[in-house]
């Protein structure tokens, strides 16, 4: 499809923060690193624009959003802050498989007085009790086998 482009192979070894028994301080440090990557890549403004476009089409501009594999929830918290400043009728939830990540995310939510609701869940088995207008994930898909990527999408 793209002449001269060599397909890259994915290295799916577990990352430091995925190691069982990892010291919580190390986990927190790893999630802070991801927060820096998200800030540098400016993913929130672009994501917000897409969410806003979806919300414009929704009745009453209501929007329910779920972030999968949220880590420290910095993206969800930032989106919720923008929505709050603009007085948008959005509900944002975020989940992660790792209870320690959710613990760290809860601290972040409290520290920033955010409305993001957090829970522990597997991205490949999200809650079926709720329906979301938008489900997204960032910095996560590289962890999955190709078949699971298709299943997730």
Model-found features: residue ranges?
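A short, conserved alpha-helix within the catalytic core of class I
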Residues: 144-153
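Hydrophobic adenine-recognition pocket in adenosine-nucleotide-binding enzymes
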Residues: 140
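N-terminal auxiliary segments of SAM/dcSAM-dependent transferases
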Residues: 1-20
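Conserved acidic residues
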Residues: 133
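Class I SAM-dependent methyltransferase Rossmann-like catalytic core
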Residues: 16-50, 54-55
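Short helix-loop-beta connector
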Residues: 55-64
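Class I SAM-dependent methyltransferase SAM/SAH-binding core
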Residues: 66-68, 72-125
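A conserved beta-strand element that flanks and buttresses the S-adenosyl-L-methionine
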Residues: 136
């Amino acid at each position: 499809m793209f002449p001269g482009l060599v397909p890259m192979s994915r290295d799916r070894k577990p990352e430091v923060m995925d190691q069982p028994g990892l010291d919580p301080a190390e986990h927190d440090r790893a999630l802070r690193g991801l927060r820096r990557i998200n800030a540098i890549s400016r993913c929130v403004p672009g994501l917000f624009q897409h969410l806003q476009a979806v919300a414009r089409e929704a009745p009453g501009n209501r929007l329910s959003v779920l972030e999968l594999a949220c880590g420290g929830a910095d993206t969800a918290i930032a989106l919720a802050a923008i929505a709050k400043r603009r007085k948008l009728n959005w509900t944002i939830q975020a989940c992660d498989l790792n209870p320690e990540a959710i613990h760290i995310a809860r601290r972040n939510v409290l520290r920033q007085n955010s409305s993001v609701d957090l829970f522990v869940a597997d991205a490949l088995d999200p809650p079926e009790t709720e329906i979301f207008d938008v489900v997204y994930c960032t910095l996560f898909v590289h962890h999955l086998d190709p078949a699971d990527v298709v299943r997730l999408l």
